[in-house]
Design a protein with these regions (language model features):
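A short, N-terminal "cap"/entry segment at the start of jelly-roll beta-barrel domains
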Residues: 1-33, 114-118
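Short, conserved beta-strand element in jelly-roll/cupin
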Residues: 38-42, 51-67, 105
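Phosphate-centric recognition/catalysis
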Residues: 45
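Short beta-strand His + acidic residue motifs that chelate non-heme Fe in jelly-roll/DSBH
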Residues: 49, 67-68, 84, 90-96
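A generic "binding-loop/recognition-motif" signal
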Residues: 53-54, 72, 88-89, 98
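Short acidic-glycine-tyrosine-enriched beta hairpin
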Residues: 72-86
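A short hydrophobic beta-strand segment most commonly corresponding to one strand
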Residues: 83, 98-113
């Protein structure tokens, strides 16, 4: 068994305005097959349209988000779970007044966020 990794001990990255992201579990942290991370989206901000080569499970812990998956928009209110299949275009917009907090899971350690045109 490995030691617990506290989310607060992992440094934040800001790949886009209003977006905070961090990888909590990855190959670099000893995982052989799973990637786990945290995503925080400020009110009014959007994680741009993108795709992954593997499926992604999104656990919405707080906030209200509009999620677009392959052109279909859905309102997601925490607490909720959403699955985006491999190769599916998706983006997430915070439509509430408080931060959207998501924990994401990939069944792989080789994961890439590929931005696509909207």
């Amino acid at each position: 068994m490995s030691e617990p990794i506290r989310f607060t001990d992992v440094p934040d990255a800001s790949p886009f305005p209003g977006i905070i992201s961090k990888l909590v579990m990855s190959r670099e942290k000893g995982s052989a097959a799973i990637t786990v991370g945290e995503l925080r989206i400020a009110a009014g901000h959007t994680l741009p349209l993108h795709v992954h080569k593997v499926e992604e499970a999104l656990v919405f812990l707080s906030g209200d988000a509009k999620v677009e998956v392959d052109g279909k928009e859905t309102l997601v209110t925490a607490p909720s779970v959403l699955l985006t299949p491999a190769g599916t275009k998706h983006c997430i917009t915070n439509v509430g007044t408080s931060e959207v907090r998501i924990v994401f899971f990939f069944p792989a350690v080789e994961v890439e966020r590929i931005l696509v045109e909207h």
